[in-house]
Amino acid sequence: MKLQTEVLVIGGGATGAGILRDLSLRGIPSLLIEKGDFLSGASGRNHGLFHSGGRYVVSDPEAARECIVENRILRKIAPHCIEETDGLFVSLPEDGLDFRNRFIQACEEAALPALLLLREEALSLEPGLNPDLLSAVKVPDGAIDPFELVLANAKDAEVYGAGYLLHAEITSLVVDGDRVKTVLAKDLLHGEEYLIEASYLINATGAWADQLLKLAGLHIAMALSKGSMLITNQRLTHRVINRCRPPSDGDIVVPNHTVSILGTTSVRLEDAENFEVTPREVSLLIQETSKMIPAIEETRFIRAYAGIRPLFQSGEKGDDRAISRGFVLIDHEKRDGIKNLITITGGKLVTYRLMAEKTSDLLCRKMGVDVSCTTHLKPLPGAEKPSGLKDRLKTLGKVETLCDCELVRREEVEEALREGKLKNLQDILHRTRLAKGTCQGGFCVYRLLGMLNEWELAEGDSNKILKGFLEERWKGIRPVLWESTVKEEELMEGIYKGIFNL
Amino acid sequence: MHYDLIIIGMGLSGLMAAKTAVEAGKKALIIGKGMGCLTLFSNTIDVFGKITETTRLRDDLSRWIYDHPEHPYGKVGVEKIEEALCSFNTFFRPPYTFQSRNETNSLIPTGIGTFRPTYLIPSTMMRGIALKEKKTLVIGFKGYKDFYSQRLADSFECRGTTLSLPESPSTEITATALARWMEQPSFREFIGTEVKKQIRDEELIGFPAVLGVNDPMGVRKDLEKKTGVSVFEIPVLPPSIPGMRIFNRFKERLIQRGVTFLMGYSVSKATLKDKRCEGIEILHPPVTTSYSADHYVLATGRFMGGGLKADREKISDPVFNLPVSQPGSQEKWFEKSFFDEHPIHRTGILTDSSLHPIDEKGELILENVRVAGTILSGHHFLEEKSREGIEIATGYWAAKQALN
C-alpha cells in the first residue's frame, strides 16, 4: 500500500504520541508508525513516577528544572493520568544529613517546593517508613499512568486529523542525495507492505534510535541502560518514597493505583530486544527498598519487569546514572546533511510534552511554518473524567466483571474493542486494566478469549494465543516466585496444565 | 483425646487414609484446614495419563514402576494401587460411579477445548469421550464467566449456545450456584425446555460440570428426559463440583462410620521425642487442644494446601519440619518456559518404602508417622497426570502400613 504524509513520526512511545498531537494541533498532517503497540518500549516499562525533579535536583539541575515546569503543566492538562500523592525524600542514619542539606538548597535554586519534615512528622504521614529515619523532605512528586497519558495523546491527535499505523516496522529508509525519499514498512501481523512518502521524518524510537538511523547509514552513540522493577501485591505507602542520597539502586517506591512499584537498577545492555530481570537485581531491590519500608521484606510480589532507558552517550564511562536524563534533539541536516530527518531521544516521561514541543518547533523552522505550540494549554481528552476506582466499586455486583482483581467490567472491554483497531491480545491488555492485578491475567485472559469467541472476534487459535500469553506472563512472575506466589502458580499450573491439559 | 490414627490433611489422600483406618476398625481423627485441592482440581481420577498406549494401564504402569522405584507408585506397587482404587470405588456405587474404559486411559473433552487423558471417569463425563464422533451441542450460561460454549464449539467443531437464565439475583453466576439450581425441578424444567428449542440434529449435549452436587445422575436423567438427547459434563475452571461430590461422599460416609472430623483447623504444634510424635496441638484462639495417637499420617498437600512452604531460601514442612528434598536455590526452582517441567515440583518429603519420613542419608526420622499424597517427593503429578492416583494409593497404603 502506498501512503503519503507531510510528517512521519516513528515510534509510539510518549514522545512519538506527544509529537503527533503537537503537530496535529498545529495543523501539520502527520502519520505515526510503531512496530508494536503504543508504549511497547520504555514508556510502558517505567515506575510511573510523576517527577517533581527532586530525583535529579542535585546531579542535574537543568533536567530538574524541566521536570518541575512540566509537572505543573501536566497537572492541568492531564489530571486524569496523575495521582497527586507528593513524595518524600527519606534520610536514613547511614545516609547522614550532608546530602539532604545540599538537596534542600538545590531545590530552592531550581524553584522546586520542598518542605523539611521531622522524623515524627514523616512517620505520622507514612507509618510504614523505617522508624529510625532521620528526616524527610516533601516534594510535589506523584504517580502517573503512562498508558492513559499516551493513549489520550494519540486519541486527540486522531481527532485533529493525524493517523497511526501500529504493528508496522520500518524495513528500509531510501536516501536520495540530502533527503530520505521513501520509507518501506511491513505490517508485522499480517505481512502487508507499505511504501510511505513523507516530506519530513521524526525519529522518536527511544532505545531503538540508533538502529533506525542505521537504515539511513547514520549513527549516534546511545547507552542502553536496563532498569528493573518489582510490583507488590498491595499499595505500601500513599506517597512516593525516595531515598535522600545520590541516585542508586533500589532507592524509590512509587504507589500506582492499588500496588507499589519498587525501583530501580541500572545495568548496561548491548541489545534492546532480549533482557530480563536477574535474581541478583530482585534481591538487591528488596534489600535496598526494605531499608526505607521494612515491610517489603515480607511483602508479596506479583511481577518483575525491566525497561530500557535510552541515554544519549556523552563519552565518559562509569555509572549510567551520571549521563544526563535531559533530552537530545538532533537536526540531521546540521549533523549529517540529511535535510528532512530529526532525532529526539533521552528525556523523561514527565518531559514528553516539552520534548514534543521542541521537536515540533524545530520542524516548523525547517518547514518555514510559523505556528506555535498549544499543548501546554489544551487539556487532553478524558481530563474531565473523575478517577476510576470509586466508580468501579459502585458497579460491583451490578455488572459483569471480567477481572476480579482490578474490577474490569465486561463493558469496558467491549468499549475498547469498539473504539478500535485492536489487532492482538496485548493491544486489549494495554487499554484496560486486565491482567494487571494479583493473578496477572491467570483468569481474566481465559475469560477475555472466551468472549472474543462469543463476539466472533477471535482471530486464530485461542489456545495458542492463551499459551503465548501464559509464557509472557511467566517472564514477569518467575523472578518473584516464593511464599504466596508459589501457591498462586500451583493454582495456575493446576488449571492450565492439569484440568485443561494445555 | 487419644486415637489409633490421626490424619493431618483433608484432601483425597487424607480422606483415603481415614477410610482405610475406619474400615480396619480403628479410631481415627482427621484434621484439615479446608477441603484440599480436591474441590479445585479433581474431576476424574488420573492415575497415569502420561502413558497413552492402548494396552491395559496396569501393565504399562508396572513396567514404568520397575524403572522408577523412587516414585510414590514404586513404593506402593501396582497391586496395592489397584487395591486402593477398588477401595475408593466402594464409596461410589451406581448410579454415580468412576470407571475406566477398557482398563486404559481415555481422552475426555475439557472446558478449554482440549482433550485430556484420564483413567477413572465419573458416569456424568463418560459420554464426552464420543464427542468427536457424535454431533454435539455445548451449553453455556449467560453470566457464568468461567465457561464459553462458543469457544468450545470452535475448538471441537460442534455447535455452542449460551442460555439466558430467568430472574438471576445477580448478573454473575458461579458454578456452585448453578449446581444448586440444577437440583431444583423447576430450574431443570426451564433448562430442558430452552435446550430443546436449540437442538437441531445433535445426539449429545455437553454441559459444564455443574449438574448438581448431591444427585448428578438424577439431574442428568431428568435433563435427558426433557431434551430427548444424551447429556454429559465437561470439567471447568475451579471450583470443581465433581470434586465436591467426592469430598461430600467421603465426609458423609466417614462420619457415619465414626471418624472424627475437625474441619477448619490446622496443627499449631507437634511434640516430637525419640523419633516419635507424642501429640499435636490445635490452637483455636483462645483455646489450645491436644490430641495424641499411636500413629500419624501427614497428608497436607503441596504449596496451596499448606503442606510445603517456600521462603526465599528453602522449602520446608511447617508441621513436623521433616527433611524436604531441595531443588537448589530459588532461581533454579522454575524453568524459563511456563510449560517446562519445573524442578520445584519434584521436591517433597523423602520417605522409605513404607512411607516413613527419612533424611537424605536414609535415616528414619519419625517411626510412628507416615507421609501420603502430593507432599511426597519424587513424582511430578502434573506431567504424569497422576494426581488422584498418587493421593488414593499413598493415602490407602500409609494407613494400611501404620495399622498393620
What do the PLM-derived regions correspond to, one by one?
Chain B
Residues M1-E83, N89-N404:
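Residues forming the flavin
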